[in-house]
């Protein structure tokens, strides 16, 4: 029982560390990639992507989109 509790605690700590490292990497980018939040106060979308006015995230450019 004690071992399983320790595994759960260490697993949650590892998950927290990995998600923090991923978030730290994402905030270091200068532009947003696919499905990245965009809009006021957020980085602009990278080349090849547009900010969707409906969903407020970066989507692939399409020929019909302005």
Curated annotation (Swiss-Prot):
Keywords: Disulfide bond, Ion channel impairing toxin, Knottin, Secreted, Signal, Toxin. Disulfide bonds join 31-46, 38-51, 45-58. Pfam families: Toxin_12. It is found in: Secreted. Its main location: secreted. One of its GO terms (cellular component) is extracellular region. It comes from Chilobrachys guangxiensis. Residues 22-29 form a propeptide. Probable ion channel inhibitor. Residues 1-21 form the signal peptide. SUPFAM superfamilies: omega toxin-like (SSF57059). This is U10-theraphotoxin-Cg1a 3. InterPro entries: Huwentoxin-1, Huwentoxin_CS1. GO terms for molecular function: ion channel inhibitor activity; toxin activity. Belongs to the neurotoxin 10 (Hwtx-1) family. 29 (Jztx-13) subfamily.
């Amino acid at each position: 029982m004690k071992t399983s509790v320790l595994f759960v605690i260490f697993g949650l700590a590892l998950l927290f560390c990995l998600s923090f490292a991923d978030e730290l990497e994402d905030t270091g980018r200068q532009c947003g990639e696919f499905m990245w939040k965009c809009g006021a106060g957020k980085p602009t979308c990278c080349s090849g992507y547009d900010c969707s006015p409906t969903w407020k995230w970066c989507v692939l450019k399409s020929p019909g989109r302005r």
